[in-house]
Amino acid sequence: MKRRFTPHRLSHRDGLVRQIDLFFETIWSETPEQLSPIDPDEWLAHYARRRYGAESSAAREAFRVLRTTVYNPSLNHNGEGAPESVVNARPAFEIRSASSWGTAVIGYDKHEFERAVQLLLEDYDTLRQSDGYLFDLADCLKQVLSNTAQEYHNTMVQAYRKKNLAVFDDYSTRFFRLIGLTEQVLGTRREFLLGTWLRGARELAEGTDDFTHDLYEFNARALITTWGSLRQANEGGLRDYSNKQWAGLTHDFYRPRWEKWVALRRAELTGEAKDRRSEMEQAEDWFRMEWKWVLGRSPYPAEVNGLDLKELAQQALAFSF
């Protein structure tokens, strides 16, 4: 199997299949003079068994589907990683990405990707003892929800432009329910907890005074949101550079921005108000809202929520557009 690069198609650099494992095996499995092609489907079938510690024909088929959707290298032409979630972006009518240099383009069949998730669920009771399996399932679920969020956002925008308040209300309600479910899915993994990141920052300041602890947390909050002050965030385009899909950040940072945007659009549809701010004024208002969170010190858990991923998966798939 020839590769010019390794594809990353799950939400923002959180990979499910360890592409590097395959990449290294392609290079170093034999001497350079004796390199032979690797059958990716056969390799993935063995990888699924090694990763999950149990045999599952459904998991093998799921990996095959993932290879032809999110891990299809021919679909990755953007060079800036995986598609970014609209939930993580500053709210707008047209969203091309969350970060300035990313993309929100999803080039694969979303429903085919969901089929891979359904396949992963088939042997849930057998595979649930595998931490790798639970990570992969959570990782895929947040991508399912991210894909559906994009469809909900598009429908909200269309309803607004057609001045259809009923449809706008319907899909904005669905959108926020989806964000809530995303928060729950993320909360099942320590890797996806804001609290893990903030605790790590404060631990780096161990042995120093309270000011230094707070400074480290301030920097940790800024790095994953505004990156810096107004100039860096807006003029420099660095806001939402990392746009992490993390529990805590999703509920307390991304969701309030969308609540504000939806409230403004609804007020326009009902004739209660008109948003007359310039684009620059809107950007400055977003920054002020974001900066308030950066300066905050609200605690976030660094332990998982203990929710059942199978139940969350069924809810996530039911959201499918």
Where are these regions (language model features)?
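Substrate-binding groove of N-acetylhexosamine-processing glycoside hydrolases
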Residues: 1-321
